[in-house]
């Protein structure tokens, strides 16, 4: 036994405090635990050994006689008393004859108290689990809280009064019994769970250091023996009278027993017990050990070590500063701690205490060791280790080598290799042999371990071998071997795919070939020898290490979770070393991240990654990511696509429609090996030409961001499919097809957003085939063919998603797939990289970092690396969290946004490209809002681009976020505001956008119109009366007639345009393609196409010359058309642009130029005209037939250049009998800017869409249904003025929309009256006969009926005046129609028969008699 502890002491000289910490887990493990849980018995021994320590000198610790002054000789009496007190029980001393003098007995009692405070420390720590109670007791002793100490024989008592407490409530009575320099028992009235409480420690320390201040008395039995009989009787009576309540019952019981005639125990035993005289001679003197408390603490320690208990966080700080580890990470750390840091710490400290007790000859050593043994055995039986191995093979099958046997062979081999390395490295002549042994161990191939514990042990042993190998100096032969292995790693010939990757070997090779001369510890690596190095060693080592980062394992995480966890950690350590070494080399950092984040087999790659690492100068135009707007660039100026990143888009293009394939092309015209980039720039004039009012670009037109979508978890070696460039954005495709990201659909699909379009259980090929990996691509060539009908992709989203498994609860069964453990690991790695860069991962959570240009914080390159790794981890986390789109808070998102604010515009530019699949639209909008307040103009610009990028998901944003995003775009330039407005409008097509938001967008369009047209600022007021009849004609001629959108295979559309004169505006009647089919359309476009018409293959040209058929250029067949075109107001008009149609709503808002209202009137014969293309191209068929009605035979239309519309000299007669008269004023030769006219039409179009949304929402908005001035009143009136500015047809269309969108009868009546005033008050009756006005008036009357019925139910006498005024207004509305008064009289009769009071009816009757319309 002595030999065993001697060996232990030689090898383990220090406690756990001096051993290796494991990522500070032990220091933080009890932050949130209960106070009763033991603290691993830390601090049981003073760190600096002093004269009072057991290992120090042999002196004592007391000041009352223990420390003698130098030069004084200790009396023999004191020496003898001290030895007697330590070795002989006091009972034996009492029986000595002749009796020992009382003074000598007092000295024996004095020396019987322990004199070393380290003993008090040890047993206090042992009882409480830490040295906290001892430290508090020491503070009480130093603050003189011990009062009235008294030692009677071997009993010490005192009163402890803490300074902050008031006696007698805060006074604690403490009693300590001791014998032979050991405390045998202690008690206190504080009620603490452990007997060795703070107050007991304070009293013991007081007795040790101030022994002379303690009143010393002989034992009670000795004092009583000196009393006479009357003195004894007096003593007993006085004692009872002092404490009658406590002592009297006990005293009477004892008297009864003494006076009893029977033989009681008190009468048969000689003598009497004396608590102050110490224990009997037969009792063994031992230190007081609270075994029950100690046993409970050991149980808690073992339970926490074997299975972490759930922790409940009760405050926000705990939620921020701690994150729950996934099971694989927690289990790995739990199994690795005993190997690296002697865990469980508490058990190891208890064993150290046992060793110290044996050293002190403490008799409690054996009982403590017994308690430990029993508890460990019971815990082992209660939680047996998983020692299962693979089942035996079935009969008839070939026996294979047991995995368990191979694992044990591997671990034994590594153990022996580590031992041989330690021994052989001691002598220089054996260094080569040691190197060969170490390399053999690192190159050892093995299968996955049979148990989890062995898996962790093997990984630890490999790291130990690598550490020992790095300490051996290398010669030329060793360096040659290292270079050979590095070359094999770089070429990929060292190992094929295997479960355990040689990452430790790669780490050693990198350390040998590339490690800096001065290591982080300040010393030169022993393996580095400049004499043996060659010029290409560093590059070779770097490429080998990077190749090792890209290696893939062949096992899945579901089968071997800890092996995958260990592989990730080894890759993380290697990548961290690489990034720190090459933190100033941007090209190498890019290679490291490409391999670490697996960008070759996934779509998680930025387009211009290297430009994001600008350290000092602000980002220039070339450094920013593909801009959604900017200056023009030369067409065809492409950067070739590389394997690391996709080529950047050229700024200046609005839609990115270059010579590559566009949306309407058939598959045969687009070869899969097309070399064209999908983002070639447009000519400079593309941004200035007008655009069709019915065409709103999708996400593709706003700039592709397909670069960072980390969703394609494909096979590592599988070649990627060629993509066809731009995705088809035809209206028949589902919503996800038009997006540039496959991860986020623009509207919910079957009850929620689908974050992915593939399942985690799919194989690598099927997964990677549905991902996009090129800039601007939203689907692969295979999926694009399948999505022509619009259902294939939606089916993939729902059916092939999870393969019947719950994604959040299962590890992937396919190798190298995302998992919760992988996401957690990359988050931790990102935080570690940030700390290495000089930043603090926690500061970004609570503070708003400065966004100034001159950033003096962390190393910029490493900071960007940490940001990208964190973003990648967030993508992994979202992949395994199907409900991530509905989250309200995420600490990971807070970290990402905080780092983005610290980094600046570079991080925001990365997010512009890749936030889909990582952040939700509200999170992006919030970040963009925060970044817009920065002082750096580049960051403000990037924030505006980020805000623009989230507007296509406006249905997921609240009005404040959309409003702020619009303001950000408006602060930059008009082009960005225009894109923002189009994005919100496109998002509103599927519903979910508030009408207030759309009205705001309409106002922004009108503001743009004013900026381009130079008109008066009447954005929020009613527009002036419409007298410029040439506006619409010029807009149609300059823009090209609006047309329907068709996908591949759809038939062309034939559009009929009505003639526009200075006097009369005839409603335009648009006929669908089903009535007037035309020839097929050509698909060839030149780079100089109009940026809006280029996206519309079914009408690729704009009419430039409109001539009479007397001078035909290209005669076209003309089909006869009916004279009357009735169009029901509730049905879809034929020829309406599909972008305006909501699939699930019965009403659609379209400009009047696309459809006619239901007016029956004779239409004159229409002569066919010819259309000349805006851009001539040989062989381009022109299927479009435009008919003009009521054109004088002698009149011709001159060439329209898009700048002005000349005066029309013809003045035909009105076409409609009794129809609308011409306006009072005529405007001739009014110049019109087509670009500004586009803005005006867009404002009207969005306003009508807002009116439609208002109708959808109004049915559930009861408080505003019948309000006199609902919030939307001003916006609706403003839209009426805008419609009047455009023309009568637009007013008619507005009336139809207002009848369905407005429910307030008061607002409807105001609209009716204002409409009549704007058109022509003198011909009000003619206007009222129009179907649109008639429908609006009828809706107003119905609303009044509903209002009256509603108010009668909830009417109170206080509301009578308001109700009577409403009746008066209703009568004015009913007077507008011939049958209206009859309906109004019926209402009054119903009101008369109602249950209301007579007073109400009298007031209504009086009002009706005095009514004068």
Curated annotation (Swiss-Prot):
Residues 55-65, 704-715 have a biased composition (Gly residues). It is found in: Cytoplasm, Cytosol. The modification Phosphoserine is found at residues 36, 48, 53, 738, 741, 745, 852, 1412. Keywords: Cytoplasm, Metal-binding, Phosphoprotein, Ubl conjugation pathway, Zinc, Zinc-finger. Residues 795-811 have a biased composition (Basic and acidic residues). InterPro entries: Znf_SWIM, ZSWIM4-8_C. Pfam families: ZSWIM4-8_C. Substrate recognition component of a SCF-like E3 ubiquitin-protein ligase complex that promotes target-directed microRNA degradation (TDMD), a process that mediates degradation of microRNAs (miRNAs). The SCF-like E3 ubiquitin-protein ligase complex acts by catalyzing ubiquitination and subsequent degradation of AGO proteins (AGO1, AGO2, AGO3 and/or AGO4), thereby exposing miRNAs for degradation. Specifically recognizes and binds AGO proteins when they are engaged with a TDMD target. A zinc finger (SWIM-type) spans 172-208. Residues 759-794 have a biased composition (Low complexity). One of its GO terms (cellular component) is Cul3-RING ubiquitin ligase complex. GO terms for molecular function: ubiquitin-like ligase-substrate adaptor activity; zinc ion binding. This is Zinc finger SWIM domain-containing protein 8. Signal peptide: none annotated. It comes from Bos taurus. Residues 45-65, 600-817 are annotated as: Disordered. The modification Phosphothreonine is found at residue 724. Pathway: Protein modification; protein ubiquitination. Residues 604-625, 729-744 have a biased composition (Polar residues). PANTHER family: ZINC FINGER SWIM DOMAIN CONTAINING PROTEIN 4, 5, 6, ZINC FINGER SWIM DOMAIN-CONTAINING PROTEIN 8.
